[in-house]
Amino acid sequence: MLILRGAPALSAFRHSKLLEQLKQKVSAVSGLYAEFAHFADVNDVLTSEEQQVLDRLLKYGPSVPVQEPSGRLFLVLPRFGTISPWSSKASDIARNCGLTKIQRIERGIAFYVEGQFSEAQAQAIADSLHDRMTQLVLGDHEQAASLFSHAQPKPLTAVDILGGGRAALEKANVELGLALAEDEIDYLITSFNGLGRNPHDIELMMFAQANSEHCRHKIFNASWDIDGQSQEKSLFGMIKNTYQMHSEGVLSAYKDNASVIVGNVAGRFFPDPETRQYGAVQEPVHILMKVETHNHPTAIAPFPGAATGSGGEIRDEGATGRGAKPKAGLTGFTVSNLQIPGFVQPWEVPYGKPERIVTALDIMIEGPLGGAAFNNEFGRPALTGYFRTFEQSITTPHGDEVRGYHKPIMLAGGMGNIREDHVQKGEITVGSKLIVLGGPAMLIGLGGGAASSMATGTSSADLDFASVQRENPEMERRCQEVIDRCWQLGDRNPISFIHDVGAGGLSNAFPELVNDGDRGGRFELRNVPNDEPGMAPLEIWSNESQERYVLAVGVEDFDRFKAICERERCPFAVVGEATAEPQLTVTDSHFGNSPVDMPLEVLLGKVPRMHRSVEREAEIGDDFDPSTLDIEESVQRVLRHPAVASKSFLITIGDRSITGLVARDQMVGPWQVPVADCAVTATSFDVNTGEAMAMGERTPLALLDAPASGRMAIGETLTNIAASCIEKLSDIKLSANWMSAAGHPGEDARLYDTVKAVGMELCPELGITIPVGKDSMSMKTRWSDEGTEKSVTSPLSLIVTGFAPVVDIRQTLTPELRMDKGITDLILIDLGRGQNRMGASILAQTHGKLGRVAPDVDDAEDLKAFFAVIQGLNSDGHILSYHDRSDGGLLVSTLEMAFAGHCGLNLHLDGVADNVSELSAILFNEELGAVIQVRQDATPLVLAQFSAAGLEDCVAVIGQPINNDEVSISFHGEPVFSGQRRLLQRQWAETSYQIQRLRDNAECADQEFDALLEEDNPGLTVKLGFDVNEDIAAPYIKTGVRPQVAVLREQGVNGQVEMAAAFDRAGFNAIDVHMSDILAGRVDLNDFKGMVACGGFSYGDVLGAGEGWAKSALFNSRARDAFQGFFERADSFTLGVCNGCQMLSNLHELIPGSEFWPHFVRNRSEQFEARVAMVQVQESASIFLQGMAGSRMPIAIAHGEGHAEFRNDDALLEADVSGTVALRFVDNHGKVTETYPANPNGSPRGIGGMTTLDGRVTIMMPHPERVFRAVQNSWRPEDWNEDAAWMRMFRNARAWVN
């Protein structure tokens, strides 16, 4: 084993933060140093050349001075017997670089902690430094040799029910955490007595997972008695009623990993499977919809819990039909009170929590990072979501109890696209190969399905922790590339059947696959790819290692499938074959036995149906009179409540421009304020149709009136999605996610009544279907606190997500008030019809109250009329701005519109209030509704349209936006409230800022927060030195000659399709080229005029961002010769964007004229930054930027490592004077800046892009390929038609080739 010291592992910011955390745990800690440690398992002595290559491979990341360490060593390594995702990628890179003597490279972190401490304190330090699920801590480097030793496989065990009877099974139930019900134990004893043998532990675990509440939805399929009355339908039956009443537009419901609805026709853009040339195929592009929850793992370990939640939902989309493509995501969180240190709010009363779960604040620091990181690395934009906190002590008929979300809601959802011919699963023929695609088995996530089905606190802490999975998004990306290549083959798609591997691992996925295909299966356990050979059969079969799919591929299609996997470097294995007989057999060649041999009907068949007999409880509530409150204090409290406050800290960490198909993200207007009502994507690059999604949830209302909370969730979804341009209300389809503390007094009846209100009443009345959903029935946390039994129970929680095809993505409305449209009015549409019900409002919550009467949807006809009028007014161009009314009420809706428009408000409440005592209720009630901005001369027409639709009593003019910073509210000329817009916006932004400050570099958070005080910020602007609508490539395109450009990607790259689309539009033939094609000699770069290295996360950024990719080219002789020859050709050009920029900067020794280039390292904020930034094009030789010098315009940013690091100040100066700086970040006034967030990565002198001395090679961190169409821009000037400013760059390349 070789031991190689690495670079320091912590930036100054992370170092001081960790040191502070350690001192809080162990006050004797006085100092800390951390560096990476690398360990290489070699089968022979390396030559000096090989050693040099290895040394260069392991030199990556920013340049930080190396120290001579002192203090006690805590060496944190991957758990022995495991292979980390880092190791598998680094080992791949080493092999690609010709280091064939290296079996494996592994990495740890050597923490040196100074101070005098006891062994108990040392243990506390060790606990703080590692994740015990995947890591261990050693005291010296030599012990790391055990990383490369392999444990012997553990044997099978049986449970002796033939001899020990029921007691033996009950004991196994507890020890294995199976969560079997009494009737299931009876069923298993009967079944195995019938088979005449004892069950193996692997069979019991498989049964427990397949039949857990998580997988089987027993409560939703149960029969019910309520108050002694038998109920006609199950919960699922009432949901299905929406489909039975209105099935039009639904292509697949209730039977696959996601639902499918009818989409628009467009030119779907992808590479031809044979020629690899990108092109558009005109066809229907149908819409997938799916929303999942991952609540239990997120409570235990928020980052991996939320990451694997997002990953699992992405796999559900990809595994729909015969393979599909995820497109855009959403994330939601509900937690208990945050109690931010130094920022605790008056309504946040400490109650405590069990040791095994983390705090609400830690969930909201780590969980969103996990969800965002997975989406970012996979390459899916996260475009909408929600965030709510709720925790309150309430009085019930059974006494006082705390209701809240110690068990959080972590929602991961999204939409995708699928070909019409692939919507339905195919046939599994007898003998079909049964394949696992993706990563290896590891001992993580064991028993997750059963664990998530228990109330938090009823299982052991070890079982809880074991049930959390760990993520590897780059592997999932490779799997998706394989699925993409398969569906792109059309009727030659080799996949006949596909499922994702989720709860229960292969023990659930393979039986489900063969059972759904009306087959049985024979499997060989040792064919499962396995990175922990010491696992027992149960562990191999049931672990929930992520990023895996199971597929059935016909024998005749197998070679085609294999070739695709090899090109994409995606692991796969044939584990079994399909049989005609419905028997499940798993053999084990190592031990020569059969761990599983049972009929599928025993596993999945006749399990007893649950029956629930429950009673309704009296509704609860308390008195709340808002008229007695001080309005100014109410405004401050409401603006700081997390459900109302800015969600910026959740949004800027998530890529919102990847795919180049995003038409509306959360950030609105020139000042990029996070207030959008819905998310909108384009169907493809050649049309203006698209897809919309929006969310609705009003969970605290359920404590007062559960059915009302369900109706309001649907109502809010509709008032949100109404901002997009949809042909008719029935085009909207809903996902319903139900969370309940089943068994808690009154909660079961509330659940039943709410499902009935939604499924049997409101949705049928609206003509809307719920074709997909999910339930989580164990939303309660119990623990003992110094002998006192405590619990926190969530309210019944329905989270609704709406999806719909969009007629015109250019007509999406936003809350940005327009000050350039003359005199305008603000009109309130109050669907509560003046009732102003305050129950469970944010204002009530900020005073520790609930109130008594909840807002509700009283008449479905009002909602239908509202939707129709808004759509009509939008189509006619009358609505300038739109925002729904929700949390915080009318006051918050109008303030958010003013924040987005950077303007003041003059509101007068004369038309909506009768007396002063009503004003607080009018400003803060959360009845359904919206505020629209219209030109004053159109106001009578607009009001008339609402009157004609029966909504005359719902509408009133409430004021005007004004062109200054003042916000004033009056009633009959008397002032009610006044304030400054920017100070109110700071209050609204402060909760987000406080969390950002704890999570990221505090200096950057301070700069962003202080920027809100700037009075004359003009926002994003455009100043071009060219005509955006001129196509300078048109003469060359007319010749019919289309030069070839290699669209280059490596494993983990995810931005190739939009890059190809930009070059295709500019008149090039874009060809898909994988690095594996170059390394194998399948592609010759001499065939191309241009090459573009695309964005993403090559090798998951292992060995540095873009560095592993670059080194696999530098140290592989075939690849090095190919790249060097290409760069030296005078007729070639190259572009590198984001990850491609990082990669090319590390190839500078091969690129003539690039000696001034920097190295790109971690952003100054220490965070992934997804923003719209202003850049100015510099005077340079870049062939891409000719005729653009001096132009200033916005561009999409999405990177974690974009900080340009030069060797020293002299090198920076040389770059400056050499004329090779191509782009600089500027502030909204046009000045070059290093200030955050205008400069999102802190690069010196605003450097954002470089070129070579002759201009043929250009690299940049921003993403022009995502914003070449006008509709792709989060904000754009109105005079942009089809093209955006960045299209000129690609056309410049086409003109240069000529």
Swiss-Prot record:
Q: Where is the active site?
A: 1138, 1263, 1265
Principal location listed in the UniProt entry: cytoplasm
Q: Name one GO cellular component term.
A: cytoplasm
Extract the InterPro entries matched here.
Class_I_gatase-like, FGAR-AT_N, FGAR-AT_PurM_N-like, PurL_large, PurL_linker, PurM-like_C_dom, PurM-like_C_sf, PurM-like_N_sf
- Which reactions is this enzyme annotated as catalysing? N(2)-formyl-N(1)-(5-phospho-beta-D-ribosyl)glycinamide + L-glutamine + ATP + H2O = 2-formamido-N(1)-(5-O-phospho-beta-D-ribosyl)acetamidine + L-glutamate + ADP + phosphate + H(+)
Q: In which pathway does it act?
A: Purine metabolism; IMP biosynthesis via de novo pathway; 5-amino-1-(5-phospho-D-ribosyl)imidazole from N(2)-formyl-N(1)-(5-phospho-D-ribosyl)glycinamide: step 1/2
Q: Which residues bind ATP?
A: 305-316, 384-386, 676, 886
Q: Where in the cell is it found?
A: Cytoplasm
A Pfam family this chain is assigned to: AIRS_C
Q: Name one GO biological process term.
A: 'de novo' IMP biosynthetic process
What Enzyme Commission number(s) does the record list for this chain? 6.3.5.3
Outline the subunit composition.
Monomer.
Could you identify this protein by its name?
A: Phosphoribosylformylglycinamidine synthase
In which organism is this protein found? Pseudomonas savastanoi pv. phaseolicola (strain 1448A / Race 6) (Pseudomonas syringae pv. phaseolicola (strain 1448A / Race 6))
Gene name? purL
